[in-house]
Amino acid sequence: MKKIKFSFNSEVEKIIKKFSLNNDWNKNINQDIDKYKSKKFNKKSFNRKDLKKLDFVTIDGEDAKDFDDAVYCEEHESDWKLYVAIADVAHYVENNSNIDKEARKRGTSVYFPGFVIPMLPEVLSNNLCSLRPGEDKFTVMAEIIIGKDGKIKSYKFYNALISSSARLTYTQVDDFLNNKKSITDKNVIKNINNLFSLYKILKKSREKRHAVNFDTQEFSFLINKNNEITGIKNNIRLESQKLIEECMIAANVASSLFIKKNKSNSLYRVHDEPTLEKIEDASVSLKNLGYSLNKTKIICTEEINKIIELSKKKLDDHLVTSIILRAMARAEYTPKNIGHFGLSLKSYNHFTSPIRRYPDLIVHRIIKNIIEKKENQYDFNNLEKIGTLSSENERNAEAAERELQSILLCNYATKFIGKKFDATVNSVVNFGLFIAVKEEPIQGLIHISSLGNEYFIHNEKKNILIGDKSKKVFKVGDKIKVKLQSAFPSEKKIDFVLVK
């Protein structure tokens, strides 16, 4: 059989076409882009609070180019004052403009390995709106007072002008927090220390309200200049990432409370409770692993966290997390507030990423209308339509990202055909076992026909496969030895066989 050469670029093109992703800008938008390139703003012309004296920093990944948030923290009497500055995209992108219509249509930026399809043109996302160090930038400011108990005591929102003091990476900040001299500026150091002190308080508050702690296993592809996969790197979630996450959650909560206080419609980020049917399915798999999940009532986040913490001690937390995640409802955008189950919050918006998420841009416009004493341009029906479209766009983008990841993993797996691995059964279905190998982030199928010289019956209630003669049982969590038999990137298919 002739081996078909794998092409990263052609696979990306197929994904773009399959998921109807738009990677080009039309003529009208290109004309607008030219205007932005020549536009010079006069900071004296706008009613903005000048906060350039504060040592804001951006903290992002090494490869980030669109810096849409900057943070600064200081002591305030016996509390903490957190400033979260978010790029003022709404200042540049007017409602129903050509760029706005295209951003609404895209809904989100789509992230592929080494390649991004942006929601906004680069002149905005990486230039005018990006909070690059040493440049005067327009922002929408969330100024939040947080008590020693981690609760928000008060908040203000206003238009502001900042100049970021430093572009830091998660690794830099994490190294600094681990007593490595990765940062030298005294004012920046003071800000980081304050942010970390606040983070520890917010972390305790998160634990107290029992927000679900999903530490999912993430990895990234190492791709060379020729777009060839040279390896896979496990991404360890750093404390610096969690620090920024907690600051963003605080700003998102404050934005939700601010809009609600001003009696305006909003576009909420909601996460419903899991259904009883999903809980029952999860409880069967968890029972096979030795965990008890109460399936007689609606599950609470405290119970989920207890199981996850216990699984970490037994070293099967990745499997347990994946089972629980499958039971969770999808988060959505809607003007109807039902709270956020996963974060254990009564009211939540997405406010902090208007460069890459359209709902955040909508929330910015609503906040700016309140600040500037203008009428809200979005009624409930408008927001409902935008929420539905944004949720669909998010799901479509995630599906595209997952599909390319699966194709790349299959291509990576071809290097290991014939190799034996230790593996764990992740899922039991009527046609076989889905397994994950220990040494690499590779998953695949052992077809039921290759399990042995007998007929295997799928007991759906117990979620097991059982041999009709030997009574051999296969269940979720079983540790087995496997051999990678074949991998077909075009079909996103990896097949294993048992090693006896």
Please report, for each region that a protein language model flagged, where it lies by residue:
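Classical nucleotidyltransferase
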Residues: S449-F456, K469
